[in-house]
Amino acid sequence: MLAATLSVGLIAPLASPIQESRANTNIENIGDGAEVIKRTEDVSSKKWGVTQNVQFDFVKDKKYNKDALIVKMQGFINSRTSFSDVKGSGYELTKRMIWPFQYNIGLTTKDPNVSLINYLPKNKIETTDVGQTLGYNIGGNFQSAPSIGGNGSFNYSKTISYTQKSYVSEVDKQNSKSVKWGVKANEFVTPDGKKSAHDRYLFVQSPNGPTGSAREYFAPDNQLPPLVQSGFNPSFITTLSHEKGSSDTSEFEISYGRNLDITYATLFPRTGIYAERKHNAFVNRNFVVRYEVNWKTHEIKVKGHN
């Protein structure tokens, strides 16, 4: 009934309205003459319904033969869930719900002198609450711990913590230049029992009558998990190394967004409600921001966005 795919366009210089803020530099001594220089960038887009809160932690360690950067990606991705009538003759009793089947988070660089050496989370995670720690020890040793609190043996550590009720986290793509995660709809608890995310009757209910609004054809807000009803608060980490003495600056693209499904509900007065589903009706609805990192001055610049 409705199919559309929107791909991310070219990253343009700053032109369209976004909100940007920068936090003050914070320096933490981590022992043995090493220190971590911390920067934070906040970039928001009303167009995409996304806020990127990105922490850039530069590790200065004379015992490590490379520059190191820990990037923690936080913020908010609005679900953009909506309910509407389907226009056209013969569709008067058909309503639709557009909702996020998947949230997308990713980091990419094309710099030949930069390598992605660690990231969190790594494996498929099905628990509602996600918590992991990335630790650093003097000399360039990065390690991950399974849960928050396991950081006593590290000179420095960063944690991730987020909630994903009814969703699972997976690494969709990973290599030395990029990592992309998908937080995907999995299984939902409904008044009728557990339902797969692929069940076409998921969220569909019978309205009180044929004159009901589009919202009445679908489950009320108190039956929708937070990632459907409001949105997702990501918390992901990547660790990058940079060849010392090569380039002064590197660029990274960080993307937050969603893939949207459409569920159609049609009321037939004699037989009742009928559901149809368009999986991945809108994909890669992502806000992509290009950041420039200066390895010498430890400055961060927002260079462009879509």
From Swiss-Prot:
Keyword Signal: yes
Cellular compartments per GO CC: extracellular region
SUPFAM superfamilies assigned: Leukocidin-like
Compartment list: Secreted
Signal peptide segment: 1-23
GO molecular-function terms, A-Z: toxin activity
Domain of life the protein comes from: Bacteria
Keywords carried by this UniProt record: Cytolysis, Hemolysis, Secreted, Signal, Toxin, Virulence
Gene Ontology biological-process entries: cytolysis in another organism
InterPro entries xrefs: Bi-component_toxin_staph, Leukocidin/Hemolysin_toxin, Leukocidin/porin_MspA_sf
UniProt keyword Transcription regulation present: no
Entries under Pfam families matching the protein: Leukocidin
Family named by the database record: Belongs to the aerolysin family.
Assembly and binders: Toxicity requires sequential binding and synergistic association of a class S and a class F component which form heterooligomeric complexes. LukEv (class S) associates with LukDv (class F).
Main function: Part of a bi-component leucotoxin that acts by forming pores in the membrane of the target cells. The activity of LukEv-LukDv to rabbit leukocytes is similar to that of the Panton-Valentine leucocidin (PVL). LukEv-LukDv is hemolytic to rabbit red blood cells although the activity is only 8% of gamma-hemolysin.
Protein name: Leucotoxin LukEv
Gene: lukEv
